[in-house]
Amino acid sequence: MAKLDVALAKVEGHHKEALLWFKRFRGQRVTWAEIKEHAEFGARLVNQAKGIYKPAYTDFALSVRTIQDGPYPDKEVEFRANGSWVCQYYQENIDPNQRDKEATNRGLMRCMEEQIPIGFLIKRKPKPGVEYEVLGLGFVKAWEDGYFTIEGINLNGETTDGIDAARARASQPLLSDPDDIFDAKDVNDLRQKQIATVAV
């Protein structure tokens, strides 16, 4: 089980400052202007030209962001009832065989190897007045066929590995939106609750 406080102790300076920003603003919406303003007075959070941001001062990637109608086949984020989430995020470069050609991808691989968290943003409002939802911090858990599996931390600041992760996925109903509320009158909600109860 990966613990966030242990992982954050591995980084320092602007890198740590930026990751703490993602932790602090988890669950909030921020404007693109606010993100750019933070870079003027503190650590840079994203790369304006790319979805993956790997600062020049480190071998690790710092953040990823998704946008509607982007050039890569990123998959929808799946939210869990315990506050965690998972996303299949596509690498930079459409050819999986060219993964290591891009510094951004190498940065995400280093994060996976050393279990350094990354920040995650989802674009929720297009121009004008672009807004992003801050999902907070997650860990790169795997790479396969061009997709990085990124697991978001739960409300206790932890994420799970291996068999535990599979068990957690089986026992936690996936929510299409983090604001979804259980409805006892909804047959699908009841079915998900029954499945989760049996799995536990």
Question: Where in the sequence are the language-model features?
Answer:
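Intrinsic structural disorder
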Residues: M1-A2, V11, V64-I67, L121, ...
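Long C-terminal interaction/binding lobes of large macromolecular proteins
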Residues: A2-A18, F22
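Acidic, glycine-rich low-complexity segments with interspersed aromatic residues
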Residues: Q28-K125
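Ordered hydrophobic segments in well-structured contexts
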Residues: S63, P117-G119, V134-L137, T149
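Short, well-ordered, mixed-charge alpha-helical segments that flank or form enzyme active sites
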Residues: K127-E131, T159
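Short beta-strand-centered aromatic/proline hotspots
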Residues: V130-W143
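Short, solvent-exposed secondary-structure boundary/capping segments
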Residues: G146-I153
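Short, charged surface segments at domain edges that flank catalytic/cofactor-binding sites
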Residues: L155-V200
